[in-house]
Amino acid sequence: MTLDEALHYIHAVCWKGSIPGLERISALLDKMGHPERTLKFVHVTGTNGKGSTCAMVASVLRQAGYRTGLYTSPYIVRFNERMQINGEQISDDELCAITEEIKPLADSIFEQPTEFEMVTAIAFAWFARRRCDIVVCEVGMGGEFDATNVIGAPEAAVLCNIGLDHTEVLGDTLEKIAATKSGIIKSGCDAVLYRSTDGVEAVVEQRCREVGAALHKVDFTQLHLRQHSLEGQVFDFGGRENLHLPLLGKHQLHNAAVALTTLDVLQKRGWNITEDDIRQGLSRVTWPGRFQIIRRAPLFLIDGGHNPQCIQALAQNIADYLPNRPLTVLTGVLGDKDYHCMYRSVADHAVEFITVTPDNPRALTAQELAKYLVSFGKPVTPCDTVADGVRLAIDHAGKDGTVLCYGSLYLLGDVINAVD
């Protein structure tokens, strides 16, 4: 099986979308001999920040000498990004071999698995074969009925910032969404919670009581920023001082506090993580596509934020890191997102918009988005391709200007390739 054949097979079931339920993934893993049962996990859910939190925890565990798996979604440039061990993506050969082995098993069960279930099974098989000491695993959507929740009790169940997203599936209130996400908390694990509303916290507390899990609420009162620049941030948290984080934005400090609380939990559970491991691991973390600088002249930043909380964080980052800088905004968006919110918060900082079409069937075309954006009274230029949009944005910004690309994670891979 070639890489194209493997990816075609995996993506061929994507028309099913994301179907909650553990029956299909359980049946498939049973035929595979349950590789997930040989692994230990840190299981991470939330509306925003879960990928960044996963990256921080995994970076520290790797620094501590553990063979650390990392499972996240979506990818930015290459599919293989979704599963990594100690920072190395799965190879094409390994991806093809495991997919070829799993294909007849998946085809033989009562209902074909969804794309996300297939990818999850492939990742678990790879992590088990490579004998990972621990896997940091990001939930796909929700928690209780997400394919990743087929695992047993994790070392830590981490609930990052909870907001209103995927409401048609997860529920239309924060409490309903929290109830679904708290389904990853199981008997015998420790739960870590990003502080939230009283209603959300009550839901999580109830779940912990029901299953007998210890709950650790992140104490953001101990979080203090010392300094920040486009090179990173220096902060204190929980008795640790002068920690360096290369990821930008106040929201990333909150994610770091969640990661540090999780690492404290792991230390108490017997994982050998030193203070130097924590400092070095945090200082070396990478997480692409989140207010990330990909070019310096002009300054070119990309951000994958696409829901109201992410856009609020982006607007704050613009104020903190790019004050009084006129922005050439390169953008594309999916039609089912709240793109009105996306642009209201950023339009005042823009001198012009350049629109492109993300590589996704749900995307607004560049022309459709341009028609909407003219209402902000700024020049708008639709482009036929992402590469054309990148060239135009760089040209219009000039070497001393600033380009901000945001609107959809599905846009960023093509932008990175075009800039390179």
Q: For each of these PLM feature ranges, what is it?
A:
Residues 1-48, 52-67, 76-77, 190-193, ...:
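N-terminal leader/targeting and accessory segments in enzymes
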Residues 22, 26-37, 63-152, 170, ...:
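ATP-dependent carboxylate-amine ligase catalytic core
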Residues 38, 134-137, 145-158, 162-163, ...:
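Nucleotide phosphate-binding/pyrophosphate-handling subdomain across enzymes
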Residues 408:
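Active-site-proximal loop/hinge segments that shape catalytic or ion-binding/gating pockets
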Residues 197-207, 211-216, 231, 299-302, ...:
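C-terminal helical cap/extension that packs against the catalytic core
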